[in-house]
Amino acid sequence: MTVAVDIGNTNIVVAVLNNGEWNKPFRVFTDTKKTGDEYYVIFSSLFDERGVERDKVDKVIISSVVPFLTRSIEKNMRRIFKKDPIMISHSVECGLNKATIPPELGADLLCNMAYGHYHHKDGAVMVIDFGTALTFSTVSKEGDVLGVAIAPGLVTAVNALFGSTAQLPQVELKVPSSVLGRDSMESIRAGIMEGYSGLVEKIIANTEKELGERLYVMATGGLSSTISTLIDRLDELDPILTLKGLGLFADLN
């Protein structure tokens, strides 16, 4: 079994890969104020609750975009499973052309592009991740990292709106009934959901124009399923694509 840990800005996502199937997933709120001992108690209890047999875990792999927590989580995984975790970095084998990987490329985006290229080798691939940040990561047919576009995530944009406008209500993001909102909640949904769907399609179109080829477009992340119905150019939706990228790294290393 392989335990995969994806440390993101909002959540820490953990899942177990067993016989090619992902199971026993859970999420823990990312909190840099928690001590290592607190995280140890949380992770230990959640693994035990889900019946994860610690002695049957062969590998632990970790991706992190939160440097402050990386060492703490790594230490706790080593303590729980008695294994040295594989840490996602530019130096480990990933199936991409390492010479083309930008020094600042985040571990999560590296996982996304590695899996996108592995999954679809017939041409260039763009992986769109609807997370805290909205990211567009593109890799060539040959496995070259072509580049990334980044925008504020949908929830990030909504939170910014609330932070500067006291009278607006909290809104659950879902597909609006109309682009012409008749109350505050529907107006925000219309602006965010319809606006972001247009942003996504524009970046896809401009990237294809710049490269001179059609992209295979994959979407992942928390809100990908919600907004996907508004975007015509998505070829595939995979909510656990980043975890699959972690699994690929585990297989290659």
Q: What spans do the regions from the language model cover?
A:
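Long hydrophobic alpha-helical segments typical of transmembrane helices together
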Residues: 210-253
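Active-site nucleophile and cofactor-binding loops and adjacent substrate-binding regions
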Residues: 102-109, 237-241
